[in-house]
Swiss-Prot record:
Stated name of the protein: Phytolongin Phyl1.1
High-level lineage: Eukaryota, Viridiplantae, Streptophyta, Embryophyta, Tracheophyta
Sequence similarity: Belongs to the synaptobrevin family.
Entry keyword set: Coiled coil, Membrane, Protein transport, Transmembrane, Transmembrane helix, Transport
Keyword Iron tagged: no
Subcellular location: Membrane
Membrane-spanning segments: 226-246
UniProt record, GO biological process: protein transport
Biological role: Non-SNARE longin protein involved in membrane-trafficking machinery.
One Gene Ontology CC term in the entry: membrane
InterPro entries (alphabetical): Longin-like_dom_sf (IPR011012), Longin_dom (IPR010908), PHYL (IPR044783)
């Protein structure tokens, strides 16, 4: 089997939505699609991935630059992230070699395309080899699994293939977000032990809530009792002072 071709459809380096370098795999719509994506670059992220259809969109953001790629879904996010990191390193290296002053000040006038073309070509070829190697490994694992299951049941290979396809499909449609933002949405299947754990957690929360409420009520009653006792003591003190001044109830007689 030859190399998997056209895994990288588009990649570019941009700053303030201005593209400083770009590679296009051939489809002219990639440029307009990339411009749209760059306008919507996710803020507060160092890197970000999203899979739509059969394409994966990757962002690497840092120092005011955005390194963006549109790749095939067969490529793993870890491989694409390494590709973007290499693109960043090579771009900065080429920029520094062509500039004598500040890197950020002179970046607009630097012609780095001639240096980046062979580098990006090499990076894409390396990425395609990684994808092809992963595909071959998955195919071998699938064949071995089907052979071992075939000796036990005629239906087992079919079930095994279906399970692997579902797992692969679910894995490829995962959207990478700061990381943890959508982790609670990825689990759609719960077993009995998970249900029991959830029930136990709810009971603990409910019990804790009741305990807090009871403690609050007790403190409130205690506070009311103290206020009433102080009020009664003040009233009795004032009444005693009044009796002492008026010598009993003589004031009322006059």
């Amino acid at each position: 089997m030859g190399l998997i071709k056209n895994t990288v459809h588009y990649c570019c380096v941009s700053r303030d939505n201005q593209i400083l370098y770009s590679y296009n795999g051939g489809d002219q719509t990639n440029e307009s699609l990339a411009a749209l994506c760059l306008e919507k670059s996710p803020p507060f992220h160092t890197w970000y991935f999203e899979t739509i259809g059969k394409r994966r969109f990757g962002f690497l953001i840092g120092d005011g630059f955005v390194y963006f790629a549109i790749v095939d879904e067969v490529l793993k996010r870890s491989s694409v992230l390494k590709f973007l990191e290499h693109l960043r390193d090579e771009f900065k290296k080429a920029a520094r070699e062509n500039s004598r002053g500040s890197f950020t000040a002179m970046i607009g006038s630097i012609n780095v395309e001639d240096q980046l073309v062979p580098v990006v070509t090499r990076l894409i070829a390396s990425l395609e080899r990684v994808a092809e190697s992963s595909s071959n490994n998955e195919l071998k694992s699938s064949n071995l699994g089907e052979q071992s299951e075939g000796s036990n049941s005629t239906k087992a290979p079919l079930l095994g293939r279906l399970s692997k396809q579902e797992k692969k499909k679910g894995k490829d449609h995962v959207i990478e977000l700061e990381e943890h933002r959508k982790s609670n949405d990825r689990g759609n299947i719960t077993d009995d032990s998970a249900g029991a754990g959830t029930s136990l957690e709810k009971e603990c929360v409910s019990s804790s809530g009741r305990s807090v409420t009871q403690s609050f009520e007790w403190k409130w009653r205690r506070l009311v009792q103290i206020v009433l006792a102080i009020d009664a003591a003040i009233c009795l003190t004032l009444f005693g002072i009044w009796l002492a001044i008026c010598r009993g109830i003589e004031c009322t007689r006059s």
